Amino acid sequence: ENVDYCESLAAKEYFSYYHEGFNRRSEDPINSRLNYGYAVVRSAIARKLVATGFHPTFGIHHDNQLNAFNLADDLIEPYRAIVDLVAHNNIASNIQLTKSERRELAHVLHNACIGDGVKVNVMSAIDIMVESLKRIILDASTEKLKLPMILPIESMEGITE
């Protein structure tokens, strides 16, 4: 069965729970928040990939020649849920995000999750995941990729912005 087709069917089903008639490409306040939050996490993953020596264009599953971030798109999936949780807080009625909303969504990188069995922020979980991918590839390891476990929305202590 075509993996892309399965992924698109799953996404369609998932997004149908947002509200009736929701389309992930529609222009509405929820979608604006989701897109911004996903972009924040995607760019953090891409930065870590480059810093670790990966070329983010070369993906494992994603392989669009016009996409410079295929590998980041492969790795973002487990982080979408945390963006979804944050994006559904205080939804405004305007498509255009305010500075405050953008700050709140960028703060997703400081939310708590479990990375390698320890409570860490999303940025640290991204570091753990990418470093584990590097070890798997370089050592031809059978180790599993260290993915985050999502927690309810909670900011790590000591981070105010």
Each model region followed by its residue ranges:
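Active-site helix-to-loop segments that bind/position phosphate- or nucleotide-bearing substrates
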Residues: E1-E161
